Amino acid sequence: MKKLGLLLFPLLAITLMLGGNAFAQDNSTYFTTYYSNANTSGAPDATLRIINDGNTDANLYADIYVFDDSQELQACCGCVISADGLLSESVNKNLTADPITGIKPQRGVIKVISSQSSDPTVISQFPGLREWSTHVQKLTSGYAMTETLAADSNLAPSEADLLSMLCSFDELLSGHPCTCTQEDQDF
């Protein structure tokens, strides 16, 4: 019995050490959120806010991919954010103003990759961005706004390849990417 305990103790210690490393890894490079009631008469505009946490003391890029509610890419762009900087993007004016289909979407999904590359067709994940967004909620009379932290998501290689490919097609077909506001300024 004592031999079994001596054998299991090192295995348990190794498991805990390796498991601790897995928990310490930073997977905050891919974020997802939604938008609703965009480009809707009488509804307020929603905002996507992204900060560079300054941990790397370097510029990072928010590679942004905007989908409609039919899961079709409508726009993509790469926006620079300096260390400790803030990027504020209007859903109506920056992200859905010039969609590839020509029809401004009212709801859909926004995906953001924290990247070292300004080109959203080149996936170069690098942690350091954080994202929040406001959401326009329809009420019986009028609209209400809520704000949430974007979901910290897992970016599979197949999803990264798909985003890169779709954005390449968007650039080839429309030539009109979403636009970036100047950092630390609202639209």
Where are these regions (language model features)?
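Short, intrinsically disordered low-complexity segments
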Residues: 1-2, 15, 110, 129
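Gly/Pro-rich, tryptophan- and cysteine-flecked surface segments typical
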Residues: 22-187
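Bacterial N-terminal signal peptides that target proteins for export
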Residues: 1-9
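Bacterial N-terminal signal peptides
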Residues: 9-17
